[in-house]
Amino acid sequence: MKSKDTLKWFPAQLPEVRIILGDAVVEVAKQGRPINTRTLLDYIEGNIKKKSWLDNKELLQTAISVLKDNQNLNGKM
């Protein structure tokens, strides 16, 4: 495992990560796209470059890690 892939998870981050994921669900639904892990990852990873999202880079990385773990555990290829 590379050092950039290690997850720094603190229980205090849970509400903020839930807010990020909730906002992503709302925005994906507004676009008329299906709400699933892949579309949420696409939305979050696409918006990481926006300046307003860069303030929460650690929280965004945590949200992405949670979605990727979910996709690995529950996804069907």
Curated annotation (Swiss-Prot):
Recorded superkingdom: Bacteria
Expression induction or repression: By cold shock, up to 70-fold at 10 degrees Celsius.
GO BP term, example: response to cold
Family indicated by similarity: To E.coli YnaE.
Record's protein name: Cold shock protein YdfK
